[in-house]
Amino acid sequence: LTHILLVDNFSVEEKNRNFTDKKFTKTLDRSEFLVWFEKNPEQVSFVYHIGARTDTTEFNIDIFNDLNLNYTKSIWKLCTVNTIPLVYASSAATYGLGEFGYDDDEKNIPLLKPLNPYGDSKNDFDKWAILQNEMPPKWIGFKFFNVYGPNEFHKARMASVIFHSYNQIKEKGFVKLFRSHNPNYADGGQLRDFVYVKDLVDVLYFAYTSNLNNGIYNLGSGKARTFLDLA
């Protein structure tokens, strides 16, 4: 990919390390992007919308409605009007406790019960997207599972379990795991689907180059592992 425009909140200096020595055309603050996009659609051929407020401990619903729901709707509408393909990040957090399984069949989306406002905001957009009659010429939503890999240093407590575990082992020689609150799982026996970020990027690029059908897909390894196995 060439002529890449990076859009983010660049006031967080720690993020600068993520794109040092990377090839891109320029950066643009997220607060300016929608206006720029509306005025310059001819400069855009494809949109990856991966950014979001992902803090699962944040309970200010207005923040999620603003950044995750309404902002994404605006990008969708601009891509639709200007016939520009869109790939966006949904989340496995939409599945909640998994009462309805983890199948990415779209008929299950209205049934899902996320556990926090972050998951709600992602599911709310998914529900909205599948009801639209007007859409980008190509659109794909990927439900990211537990992504880990390089450049998580700016994410603080929201970095992956693998990132935190690695640093604990490096500093203390051991890793401290969460106690299980589900009687069906022993301590350390909780399951997560961990997916390496570079594998995820390969799939995102595949979505750019392929004729994948429009819709919402799971994006994980396809195999859950326990925290004990991870440790």
Question: PLM features: what roles do these ranges have?
Answer:
Residues 66, 70-74, 81, 85, ...:
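Catalytic helix-loop patch of NAD(P)-dependent Rossmann-fold dehydrogenases
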Residues 9-10, 92, 222:
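Conserved short acidic donor-positioning loop in nucleotide-sugar-dependent glycosyltransferases
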Residues 129, 204-208, 231:
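Hydrophobic "lid"/C-terminal helical patch
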Residues 1-46:
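N-terminal Rossmann/SDR dinucleotide-binding element
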Residues 123, 135, 147-163, 171, ...:
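Glycine/proline-rich active-site loop of Rossmann-fold NAD(P)-dependent oxidoreductases
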Residues 69-73, 198-201, 205:
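Conserved active-site region of classical short-chain dehydrogenase/reductase
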Residues 30, 36-67:
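NAD(P)H-binding glycine-rich loop region in Rossmannoid oxidoreductase-like domains
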